[in-house]
Amino acid sequence: MAALVLPNSLPEELAARTFLRFLRGAPRPAAGGAAPLAYRLAYVHDLLVELARHGLAAPDAAAAAFGGARPPPAPAGVPAAAARAAILTVEAATRAQSESDLWTLLRRGLATASTVRWGADGPHFPPTWCEASTARCGTPDNAALIFGRV
């Protein structure tokens, strides 16, 4: 995936695409539950699709980062190594803009994903603390975060 050159400030519509909002609109999993990792990947994938739709990324950016397909929200759907590779690909493509709105959104979104309580029927709501702001702030020292841990 080629480097993404994004404006430091994303359009308001994109800056508002929090992980919580993504989860609220995500389909509920079939019997057997869903992997929290798969939802994280689907969120990052959807952000890349929206960046492309707004002309801020190549039309194939999401496909390039995820090996040509949307990650399915199912436990067996995404091997851990493939998930890590996809996220690191996105991080590498945007590393020069670590203070951009995209990284702020991803830091908060992926931290939110780590704190959501998951059950057999998917995420339990509401982790409302992430609704307050997506303003930039220091990166927490959390091993669950990839973005910002170069």
UniProtKB/Swiss-Prot annotation:
The record's EC number reads 3.1.-.-
This protein's source sits in the domain of life called Viruses
Which Gene Ontology MF annotations are present? endonuclease activity; exonuclease activity
Supply the InterPro entries for this chain.
Answer: Restrct_endonuc-II-like, Viral_alk_exo
One Pfam family recorded for the sequence? Viral_alk_exo
- Key words of the record: Endonuclease, Exonuclease, Hydrolase, Nuclease
Q: Which family does it belong to?
A: Belongs to the baculo-herpesviridae alkaline nuclease family.
Q: What is this protein called?
A: Alkaline nuclease
Which source organism does the UniProt entry give? Answer: Suid herpesvirus 1 (strain NIA-3)
